[in-house]
Amino acid sequence: MTKTIFISTKENTGSIQFQIVNFTKKICKLTNHLKLHKKDYLSQRGLRQMLGKRQRLLSYLSKINLTSYNDLILKLKIREAKKDLF
């Protein structure tokens, strides 16, 4: 998974897609760390926070641009966000 797929220019680092890719990369690193260090509770808390931030960004992207959202989910191989029940 590379960031260059989603970056058109160097100034585009604030885009939603780039932020989601960046969070996904950090989540993968932290998941591998937690496989070795199971009792690292501070890292577990950080992982939950990152998952929440990525989830909020994904739901925002799905409301703004559904085609970009679907492409991003397929390329990153992550599950689709749960839809609001209300």
Curated annotation (Swiss-Prot):
Superkingdom to which the source organism belongs: Eukaryota
Gene coding for it: rps15
GO molecular function: structural constituent of ribosome
GO BP terms, alphabetized: translation
The species this protein was found in: Cuscuta obtusiflora (Peruvian dodder)
UniProt main location, coarse: plastid
PANTHER family membership: RIBOSOMAL PROTEIN S15, BACTERIAL AND ORGANELLAR, SMALL RIBOSOMAL SUBUNIT PROTEIN US15M
The protein's name in its UniProt record: Small ribosomal subunit protein uS15c
Entry similarity comment: Belongs to the universal ribosomal protein uS15 family.
GO cellular component: plastid; ribonucleoprotein complex; ribosome
